[in-house]
Amino acid sequence: MSGRADSIDFKTANLCDEFEQSVGVAEPLLRDYGGNTSFYGSLATVKVFEDNVLVREALETDGQGRVLVVDGGGSTRCALVGDRLAQLAYENGWTGIVVDGCIRDSEEISRLSIGVKARHAVPKKSAKRGAGERDVPVRFAGLTFTPGDYLYADPDGIIVAERDLLA
């Protein structure tokens, strides 16, 4: 089961305490930008570099309460998500977007009821080449994010587990 953060109350600190041996804890590299700072769901992945075509393609699908994890290689030269993609994600039922890279339109994104975590905000848009991979394991912040695993995020950080800890 996945869902919007307002449907189930959780704290990553409590989940870490209760499931210490079965969760991975991300290094604190990302900050909150979205209107929801607590979100969770089964995760899907995209691996790209300074190109957000595959990010858009993923967010155009039915999110079904999932979280999109974007491995952008940590680039700070351009944004992989802006307000239109964040709005699209919200409308299509995604609960959150986690970006190892940058976003833009941060003020607008902060008003949307979706979780968004990223390294930084930068005004420059990305290229549109369509290069990259979808639904593959990606690694950043000291963790491997595998499609189908569960991601839990709140102001304390991000944790990942192989199963739904809230079921």
Task: Name the predicted role of every residue range.
Residues 2-147, 164-167:
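Feature captures the catalytic cores and cofactor-binding loops of soluble hydro-lyases/lyases
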Residues 85, 156-157:
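A generic "binding-loop/recognition-motif" signal
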Residues 144, 157-159:
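Short, charged beta-turn/beta-strand-edge "cap" motif at the junction between a beta-strand
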